[in-house]
Each structure stands twice: as structure tokens, then as C-alpha cells.
Amino acid sequence: MIWVWGGAAVAVVVILVAVLFTLSGSPAKKTSSDGLVTTFLPGEFQTVPTVCNSVTSATLGQYLPGKLHMVAPHSLDGSAQSLCNWTLDTPPLYRVLEVTAQAYAPSGLATGDGSATFAATDAYQQALQAKRHPAKGTHLPAAAVTSLPGLGTTAFAALQVIVTRPDATDLETVVARDHNVVVTVVFQGPHDHTARYGPVSPALLQAGAAAAARNVLSQLH
């Protein structure tokens, strides 16, 4: 995706590593003959909340203060997935917040017993690996990764500085897992002063991304 400010195009390729599993509404046995889990277990979620409604106005007002443009991309997985993007473009402020929530289903391709939680754990680990060691074709730098205790079952934050001369963008990604749900938040803004915009601190980006993720996780039921 490409964000433009000050006459310069900043190409930011955001890889949200998420393997979409089709949810079945038909009854299923708890385990298959080979011991794999084939249905949702207690505490797992079959749907996710609507992200656009879950991120609170308080969070948006604190981290994206100003008039926002909101877009709700179409889900490719029904009620098991929800996406929402907000853009703040009021010089000297420029920020983009992207939030995705995905509920994973049991899968024979998952590790462990194939449960929905194992499927989500696999996706979480793949996302972490992609930040530490980005695929060569993405042209993204390796991220500075930190853990975020107390956010979901497990969570991490990853900061990447995307340089497209003469400008640079700070890209903060927070990925949090709660049972079989993975919430991915990408929050970005200018790294340095530009002709129209001022920089945004990495600390603010991480705090905003974590707050958005916490908002979504709090609505799981």
C-alpha cells in the first residue's frame, strides 16, 4: 500500500501473516480418528467483534487527534474476520492505523492437535518470524521486536523504519493472541520532519497500537 505526503510516495508493504481457515457451520466430532481436534474448544471464539466499532473514540482521539477518514475493507472470512483502517491527514499530523482481527478454526494443517488455538498460535509465530526476518521480496528491514506482557495471551510489538529517500516512515506493528484469535495492529507515521508533516514518536505509535489491540480483545465473547 502507498501513502503519499510532501510530494513523495512512501511504499509500505505490510505483511499481515494470517492463514484464513474456512469455518464450517455443520456439526463436527470433537476429534478425528487420528486424534486431531475438529471442533471449537471451550474458551475459543468462532467470531470476532466489528473492529471499526471496537476501537474506542477515546483511543482514536488520543492517538489520532483530528478529522479521520475511516475505511472498512471487506472480510474474506465472514464474521471470523474484521478489518478497519483510519487515516489522519491534518498537517502537521499524518498517521495511519490499520486493525485486523481473525478467529482461527481447527485445521489439520496446524501444529499440535490441530485445534483452533494451535492454528492461531502458528499464525502468531509466523507473524513474529516475518518481522524478525522479513522475506527478501518485501524490501522491509528487520524489526526491533519487544514483548508486551498483559496484552491477551501473548503479544509483541515490532518497529520498522522504512526509508524512501528523502522521507522515512516509522511502522509499528502489534500482534496479540487470545486463545484462537489474533489481532494485528499497524500504526505508522513520519519518522522525520517533512515539508508538511512532523515526526511521530515510536513510543506513541506502540502505545496507540497496543491500545487499539486491547480495545478489540476486550470485546471478544
Which residues are covered by each model-predicted region?
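Intrinsically disordered, low-complexity Pro/Gly-rich regions
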Residues: M1-A9, A18-L20
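Generic detector of intrinsically disordered, low-complexity, polar/charged segments
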Residues: W3-V4, T22, S32, P149
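N-terminal leader/presequence regions that precede the main folded/catalytic core
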Residues: A11-V13
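Hydrophobic single-pass membrane-insertion segments
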Residues: A18-K30
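A small/polar (G/S/T-enriched), proline-flanked helix-loop surface module common
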Residues: P27-H221
